[in-house]
């Protein structure tokens, strides 16, 4: 059997044909910093950095500023001549505009003779009857007549103006019979007063009619404005609340413009309060003290009654009661009544603070004292009234006798490092004499003498150092007061 082979060629159905991308222009090859400007055709730099290439057909602009004398740094094409002048695109455009303006100034409008020569072909001339000179003079005359202006007339003086009554044209024929004094040249005092009174009454009625007309126009425009505003609110009210999401750029711009128009010349915050106070002051100044009660609306007055008389104080914002009667409002949570004391209750409204039971300044409870002062140790009476025999003077402490060795162990060190002898109140003199006798009988006289000499020298120096500050303490008779050495 013969086999038939069928080759199925692949089709392009369902395949996306790749669209060849347009090759993007190469960017500038400026080395100092990256530049995204496209290159010039056939060059490696953009128009801004083309001067970096010395072989490029460009040079620096020849424009020099008249203010600072600096030359333009932009690039300009090289001229054909070597010493030619070339400008960049901006200065070339400015130069062309300046030349165009100068040509307009130097070239005035068409002259009259030029126009006559152009219009001479349209003039009707008889054959052989007129010469070119006569036709030109005729055309000049026609042109002069056509160019006649009001400036050639003489100015009108005051005497030449019309002195008629403005209402005379509106009067009817019958009015001449009703007003016999209309054309009279001389009037009496009564006639003048009567005429002026009638004119003032007429003027008053005209002013009243004019004000009524203006009021009608104002109401009509306000009605149209409110109607248009209602239509805009119905059409754009939802979009104003939801925000500009989902709107086009043009719709967003129109929405922003509409919001700006709504906020135009509207007062907010402190400015609105000051404007209301200014209006109230103006009303008081114009209407007098009789209108003072009407400046505050009934809705802004407190609703509380005191002895069957309504409170005249102004209510707090967003409430119907004043500060004194705000506790009568059961829905408010910002104020509470002061509890006061058990003897004298107090119902003064107090703002709710961090504490659960707020109080007014008169019944405010002070917190417990956080700081407790340290207790001062009292000095015993026996030390204060001690006998004077226990105090040693400076003469008694002179190094005339040897001190016992036991005193050296009891030496104290003060702040400056100098040792001082112990207080005489800390030991018994009888015990000291017994210890001294026992030490002498020991037989070690040499060591005891050396120790006694060192102790005497140290004790004398410390006693002298402690005695000098005591010189400043004096009694009333000028003698120093004996003090104890601590």
Curated annotation (Swiss-Prot):
Annotated segments matching region Required for interaction with other NSL complex members: 308-364
What does the record note as the disruption phenotype of the gene behind this chain?
Conditional knockout in podocytes results in glomerulosclerosis and kidney failure, leading to early lethality.
Acidic residues bias (residue ranges): 167-178
Q: Where is the composition biased (Low complexity)?
A: 442-454
Which keywords are on file for this protein? Chromatin regulator, Isopeptide bond, Mitochondrion, Nucleus, Phosphoprotein, Ubl conjugation
Q: Name one Pfam family in it.
A: zf-C3Hc3H
Record has Ubl conjugation as a keyword:
yes
Q: Where is this region: Disordered?
A: 127-182, 440-486
Which GO annotations describe the biological process of this protein?
chromatin organization; positive regulation of DNA-templated transcription
Q: Which residues carry this modification: Phosphoserine?
A: 147, 149, 168, 172, 175
Q: Phosphoprotein: is it a keyword of this entry?
A: yes
Kindly list any coiled-coil regions of this protein: none
- Assembly: Component of the NSL complex at least composed of KAT8/MOF, KANSL1, KANSL2, KANSL3, MCRS1, PHF20, OGT1/OGT, WDR5 and HCFC1.
The UniProt function text for this chain reads: Non-catalytic component of the NSL histone acetyltransferase complex, a multiprotein complex that mediates histone H4 acetylation at 'Lys-5'- and 'Lys-8' (H4K5ac and H4K8ac) at transcription start sites and promotes transcription initiation. Required for NSL complex stability and for transcription of intraciliary transport genes in both ciliated and non-ciliated cells by regulating histone H4 acetylation at 'Lys-5'- and 'Lys-12' (H4K5ac and H4K12ac). This is necessary for cilium assembly in ciliated cells and for organization of the microtubule cytoskeleton in non-ciliated cells.
Name of the protein in its database record = KAT8 regulatory NSL complex subunit 2
Organism expressing this protein natively? Mus musculus
Instruction: Give the source lineage, highest ranks first.
Output: Eukaryota, Metazoa, Chordata, Craniata, Vertebrata
Q: Which gene encodes it?
A: Kansl2
């Amino acid at each position: 059997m013969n086999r038939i082979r069928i080759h199925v060629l692949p089709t392009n159905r369902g395949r996306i044909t790749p669209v060849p991308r347009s090759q993007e222009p190469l960017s500038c090859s400026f080395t100092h910093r990256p530049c995204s400007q496209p290159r010039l055709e056939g060059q490696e730099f953009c128009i801004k950095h083309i001067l970096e290439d010395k072989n490029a057909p460009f040079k620096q602009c020849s424009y020099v500023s008249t203010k600072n004398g600096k030359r333009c740094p932009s690039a300009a094409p090289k001229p054909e001549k070597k010493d030619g002048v070339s400008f960049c695109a901006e200065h070339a455009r400015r130069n062309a505009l300046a030349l165009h303006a100068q040509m307009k100034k130097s070239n005035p409008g068409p002259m009259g003779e030029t126009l006559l020569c152009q219009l001479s072909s349209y003039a009707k001339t008889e054959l052989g009857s007129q010469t070119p000179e006569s036709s030109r003079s005729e055309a000049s005359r026609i042109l002069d007549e056509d160019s006649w202006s009001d400036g050639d007339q003489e100015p009108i003086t005051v005497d030449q103006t019309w002195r008629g009554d403005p209402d005379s044209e509106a009067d009817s024929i019958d009015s001449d019979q009703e007003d016999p004094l209309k054309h009279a040249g001389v009037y009496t005092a009564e006639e003048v007063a009567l005429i002026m009174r009638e004119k003032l009454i007429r003027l008053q009625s005209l002013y009243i009619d004019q004000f009524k007309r203006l009021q009608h126009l104002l109401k009509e425009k306000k009605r149209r404005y409110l109607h248009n505003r209602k239509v805009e609110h119905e059409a754009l009210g939802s979009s104003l609340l939801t925000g500009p999401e989902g709107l086009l750029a043009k719709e967003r711009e129109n929405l922003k413009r509409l919001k700006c128009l709504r906020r135009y010349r509207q007062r907010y915050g402190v400015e609105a309060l000051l404007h209301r106070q200014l209006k109230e002051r103006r009303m008081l100044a114009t209407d007098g003290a009789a209108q003072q009660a009407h400046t505050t609306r009934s809705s802004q007055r407190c609703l509380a009654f005191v002895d069957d008389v309504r409170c005249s104080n102004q209510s707090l914002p967003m409430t119907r009661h004043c500060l004194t009667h705000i506790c009568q409002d059961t829905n408010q949570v910002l104020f509470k009544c002061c509890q006061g004391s058990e003897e004298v209750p107090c119902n003064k409204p107090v703002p709710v603070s961090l504490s659960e039971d707020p109080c007014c300044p008169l019944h405010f409870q002070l917190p417990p004292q956080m700081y407790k002062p340290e207790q001062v140790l009292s000095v015993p009476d026996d030390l204060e009234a001690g006998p004077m025999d226990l105090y040693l003077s400076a003469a008694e402490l002179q190094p005339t006798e040897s001190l016992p060795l036991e005193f050296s162990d009891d030496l104290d060190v003060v702040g400056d490092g100098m040792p001082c002898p112990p207080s005489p109140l800390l030991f018994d003199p009888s015990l000291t004499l017994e210890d001294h006798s026992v030490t002498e009988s020991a037989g070690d006289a040499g060591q005891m003498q050396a120790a006694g000499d060192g102790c005497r020298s140290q004790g004398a120096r410390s006693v002298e150092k402690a005695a000098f500050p005591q010189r400043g303490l004096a009694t009333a008779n000028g003698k120093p007061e004996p003090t104890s050495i601590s």
